Amino acid sequence: MLEDEEGLLLPGGKSLHAQNEKELRDVQLQNGYVRTYAKNKYYTGEKLETKIWVGDYTDNGTTDIYAKQSTGINRIAVLRADVDDLGQTFVAGFEKSKKTLSRMATLSRQMSLFFKFHINQILNQGSSSLLSEAGPRKVTIVYSGGDDLFLVGAWNEVIACAIDIHKALEQYAIGALHISAGIGVFPAKYPLSVCAREVEELEQKAKDY
């Protein structure tokens, strides 16, 4: 953020600029520099005040590309998932003497951090399985935040992602939280909005299982 009128205009005579690390170092020396907003970076220091976590992993594929990259049949898969009984965890997950606002706020922040930050690393460093080799997954996150996840990719890669995420959350929460997911396999041209609705029903069936 700078005090000028050359970027995206903000109230108070300030503007927002998108810059790489080298450009940022130069800008920080200017008199009009106000602060930095960093996306998925652990920048710290004076006027480095706001960290923005975004679950935005993608290998820049399209549905057509994902279908061609899949193993066997040329299909994509859509996954929708969320954490089981998270509301109940907030209500009854703490001992009475330890049920404080600060602990509940910390739990909320840590869940958000998993789905907005750690999820990118999980998908970028996928584990080897029968369905996929180790390495970056051939998927794209459509939405990830709170305790919800929606992604699309090559069908075998999406299933491998589900396994990776399940294991990662189990380790992250020391086995205290579990996640349910619905996965649907579709032709590449099938409307994504319809995929989302159909997979939402599968997700609910998984929760009821």
Q: What would you call each of these model-derived segments?
A:
Residues 1-209:
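Regulatory/sensor and coupling segments of signal-transduction and defense proteins
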